[in-house]
Every structure is written in structure tokens, then in C-alpha cells.
Amino acid sequence: MKQVHFFILWFFVLNLYSIKAQAGCRTPNGENARCVPINNCKILYDSVLTSDPEVIRFLRASQCGYNGQPLVCCGSSASYQPPPTSASIRNRRPELLPNDCGYQVEADKILNGDDTVPEEFPWTAMIGYKNSSNFEQFACGGSLINNRYIVTAAHCVAGRVLRVVGALNKVRLGEWNTATDPDCYGAVRVCVPDKPIDLGIEETIQHPDYVDGSKDRYHDIALIRLNRQVEFTNYIRPVCLPQPNEEVQVGQRLTVVGWGRTETGQYSTIKQKLAVPVVHAEQCAKTFGAAGVRVRSSQLCAGGEKAKDSCGGDSGGPLLAERANQQFFLEGLVSFGATCGTEGWPGIYTKVGKYRDWIEGNIRP
């Protein structure tokens, strides 16, 4: 503890003025916050012993006074976080995102372990690719947000996936079991009356600040405009988007959905669901920092439980929070992680709420 106090005094130039604790302030990232003693700000206090020069610079820039001990402007981050680029406010079209979103038809929820039933998560999309030999496969996921747009990861529409897997070919909605037609389930073999639909891709819009090949995968988000409007059914419905200022809580269990690899290493034919806990941002940053990856506030960490995580085929797929009235919100997009299901290593998700303005500014009727 004495060592920590020494470093605190070493970090900060002790200004000759005093400021009232709990006064309003603005962090180096421009976030409105409160000026508090350093030991009352866990996110900054825990980073005092860092050797990262940028974090040290951020700590010093966070000092907002001195009142017996350094006071700091205590926000949500301990490092500089360039805000996501958003479209001009005048171009935003929030009315194109439906209010009737995030609902699913009530059904028996569990068939076998993490299997879903056909009515669950009806916004889940499969993104298909075709290579030069006309071989087709689904390699990414996405989520329907209105009758014309899918939101997915930028790495699913650009870069390596196009070189290795093939060109973007189609989007499938309303799928449940890729091995059966029609989809039937249960002891009495209840069959889904609607077939899945395949739609063409009119346009893809990746975030302008996404850098292909970056190990940090900042701004890993993209939109796919379908070639026609979608009619909503019990098996095809849009998900809700969170507001930019809405945050999930550490320990809160969210649901990741997709057809990715199971614990056997095989891709599932049935749409899967898995509950994963939200991990503290600073703990996640420390874990991945050891591997040279810097996690930002525009990213969300969840998982880290042994043999429980999203895997390769789920890239771009949804991480969901269930709120009041059983309404689901798209909190994250599967971006990347360590080896699938490795204990202590959570998955990294693009935090969708941080990009709502960008989404609203890039969709059209």
C-alpha cells in the first residue's frame, strides 16, 4: 500500500490550489464526471502502477486539484479513447429503426443444452459467401435491425474473409436448423410453417475508421443493405439497439447467439445460445494488454468461463441483453478473442450503443 501511495505522489504534480471534492469536471476524453480523491476512483487508482506511457499521460491529465491528496476527474476509462466517428446529426434517421423490436414469440425454451427453438432470437442472420469455385458457405452472423438492414462486424464484409472464404453472396433469415427442411423439433415433431429466406446484398457499409488486419479491431462494425424489404413473421423480426449512454453492468449475463463451433469443435447445425457474464473493462484491458491488445471503451468484454464462449462461426453475431417485458437489445457484436472457451480470457465485442448515431446516419428507406 505504501508503494501505491508513493507512486500516486510521483504521478501527479501537486498543484498549489484546492478544489472541492465531487465538483463537476471533464475528463481528458471529454466525458462529464466528478472530481474525487484518487483512492475513490477505482478505475484510475488501479492503473497507477502501469508502465504504459499513454496511461501515465492520461492519469496526469486527469488531475483536477489537490485537497490533502490528488483529486482526479473520474470517468469510465483510464486511457485516451477517441470517440467513434459518427455521421452528421442532420443525416440521422432514427425513425427508420422500429419501436416494435426485440420481441420473440413465447415457446418452450430448452430443447437440448444450448439449443434454441425456432422462434427464439428471430433477428439472427447468417451471412453467406461464395468462392471462385462456386462453393458456398456461411461464415459470419449478423442481426436484423429493420426491414432492410443487417448489422454485423466490419471484418465480415472486408479484408481477410473475402480473400480466404469468398465474396459476399447472400443473407439468410429465419433459419434454425441448417441440416433439415422443413425445421421440425420436439417429441411430437412440431414443424416450422415458414421456410428460411435468402436475400441478395445491395450494399455494404463498413465503419470508416475500421482498419483491416488490426489486432485491436477498433470500430469493428458494418451494415448490410438487403436487396429488398423483409416482411416480419414469427421467425423474422428486428432487434432493438441500445442508446449511446446505456451501459450493461459487470457480472450481468448476456446471451450470445449463433451457429459457431460447439465444445466438440464442430459447427452446430442448430442455432445456439449461451449466457456469458460481462467482465470489468479494466480487468479485460489488463488481460489483453499482456498480449499487446489494447481494449477501448467502444468495446465490451464478456465470457471467460471455461468451455463457454462464442467461436469462429459467430463472428458479427449478436450479444444480447434481455430487459423489461422480455425485450432484447443488441449490446454487442462478436469481434474477436483468445482461443475459444479459454478460462480467464473473455471475448471482445463491439459495443453497439456507441455506434447508434453512426447506424442512424447510414441507413435509408
Curated annotation (Swiss-Prot):
Signal peptide: 1-23
Compartments in which it is found: Secreted
Free-text domain note: The clip domain consists of 35-55 residues which are 'knitted' together usually by 3 conserved disulfide bonds forming a clip-like compact structure. The clip domain is necessary for regulating the zymogen activation.
Enzyme Commission code: 3.4.21.-
Protein name: Phenoloxidase-activating factor 1
Disulfide pattern: 25-73, 35-64, 41-74, 101-240, 140-156, 184-191, 284-301, 311-340
Residue positions with a glycan: 131
GO molecular function terms noted in the UniProt entry: calcium ion binding; endopeptidase activity; peptidase activity; serine-type endopeptidase activity
Site (Cleavage): 109-110
Activity regulation as described: Protein stability and endopeptidase activity are calcium dependent. First cleavage on prophenoloxidase PPO1 and PPO2 is not dependent on calcium; however, cleavage of PPO1 and PPO2 to their active forms is dependent on calcium and on the presence of PPAF2 and PPAF3. Cleavage of PPAF2 is inhibited by calcium. Inhibited by ethylenediaminetetraacetic acid (EDTA), p-nitrophenyl-p'-guanido-benzoate, diisopropylphosphorofluoridate (iPr2PF) and p-(Amidinophenyl)methanesulfonyl fluoride (p-APMSF).
Protein's GO biological process: innate immune response; proteolysis
Binding site for Ca(2+): 175, 177, 180, 183
Domain Peptidase S1: 110-364
Pfam families the UniProt entry points to: CLIP, Trypsin
Recorded family membership: Belongs to the peptidase S1 family. CLIP subfamily.
Annotated catalytic residues: 155 (charge relay system), 220 (charge relay system), 315 (charge relay system)
Assembly mode: In the active form, heterodimer of a light chain and a heavy chain; disulfide-linked.
Boundaries of every Clip domain copy: 24-74
Entries under SUPFAM superfamilies matching the protein: Trypsin-like serine proteases (SSF50494)
Keyword Transit peptide: no
Keyword Membrane recorded: no
